[in-house]
Amino acid sequence: MATALVNARVLTADGFRDDVAVLVDAGVIDAVVAADDHRVSDFDIEDLGGDLLLPGFIDCQVNGGGGVLFNDAPTVATIRRIGEAHRRFGTTGFLPTLISDDIDVMREAIAAVGAAIAEGVPGVIGIHLEGPYLAPARRGVHDETKFRIPDADDIALASSLRNGRTLLTLAPERVPVDSIRELVRRGVIVCAGHTAAT
């Protein structure tokens, strides 16, 4: 069904606009047009009563939600529950986030995210691995007994997700530059965090 969303404060690239209509066809935004555009009359009208209309939020660090933590149960069911909890607040895309943990838990988490994407769990766009390549002095809530310097197996695992994006937070002073280069070459988005670098 094609719908024109009208009478809303719409967030656009130019800021909030009150004088536009959002044309939606089959659940996809087709166009944002002037409210008096002739095409609006070709759509079913849905009056939003002056409410805000915003794009969905993308959250790149989601450790849990709905009463569950990803580290405690890195499964598709956990990811689904986390997504449902965050969707109520406007999150439409997210990266389930695993903090520093054992290699087996990392493997389970990456497999669960891959399966969630393959199954079409709404909103899952990849995984965020926050550690375990972090600085002990900046560990925050991370268990430093899980910290390590990545080897070739770690790099292969961190870059193993095939159907989504991988964001990896690491302390650059704890990871050899060649390892960082290899991660990037393999498509991993590398971010500095929990670092004591100056």
Describe every region a protein language model picked out.
Residues M1-V40:
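N-terminal metal-binding scaffold of metallo-dependent hydrolase/deaminase domains
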Residues I82-G83, R107-G114, I155, I180:
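Generic structural signal for well-ordered alpha-helices
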Residues R148-T198:
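Histidine/acidic residue-rich metal-binding segments in metalloenzymes
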Residues A8, V22, G27, G50, ...:
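Divalent metal-coordination and catalytic microenvironments
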Residues N63-G65, R80-A109, G123-A135, R162-E173, ...:
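Divalent metal-dependent hydrolysis catalytic cores, especially in the metallo-beta-lactamase
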Residues G64-V76, V141-R148, L167-T169, C191-G193:
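Active-site mouth loops of central-metabolism enzymes
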Residues L53-G67, E130-V141, V175-S179:
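N-terminal small/glycine-rich loop or linker at the start of catalytic domains
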